[in-house]
Amino acid sequence: SNPIRYTVQWDLNDGTLSGPPAVNPNGGMTGYTVEDADFVMQPASRPGYAFEGWYDNAALLGAPVTALRTMDAENKHYYAKWSAPLQYPVRYVLNDSAANPATVPASNLLRYSIETNGGGTIHLNPAFRQGFDFLGWYDNAAFAGGPVTDFPATDATPKTYYAKWQIKSYRLQYHLNGGSGSHMPINPAVNPDRYTIEGAVPLVPPQRQGYTGIWVENGQTVTNIPAGSTGD
């Protein structure tokens, strides 16, 4: 007579978890007889979670089962156990300097899991750096492609984002205050009409026949624009 065939059922326990469904490499094993060789179980997998074993009871009590012994000669039902959601780091490369550091908003996450925001979208807010326009977060150091404004929690991988900046240019306006004809004051051509936060800008005094010129701002004599200055 033929040996009795016993059933094998697999419960992945993934109905309440976020993200893609779990994968069971043992799914083809649906039954056995006492004449079959023992079956060594393979771990299931699920993005965002660590597999912690197959159990022979729904309460996940006792030790995990690693092999089905065919001499047990009974129907089997195995249950997958999963870890808490794995935490993935989010790293921000600010591409700034010690003299003028950038800041990342506190609202930008430093870690996330597949269940963050209910498994939905994680938003990246702009960084700030004095004297620069923020052009976006990029997922590569070469700034190839477009900037990234958000990513799905279901990516379940470590993230690194690179800040891209464009230095701001500020206007310089000169008011020469009076004179006419040969006595018209002159602003030396070497004086720039724009400047940036990086590097001091020396200012050559205005020239007027018979006068000594100085530049004044808010009642103070100005001989240069100091490094670190901003604004028109």
What are these regions (language model features)?
Residues 1-232:
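Secondary-structure capping and domain/repeat boundary segments
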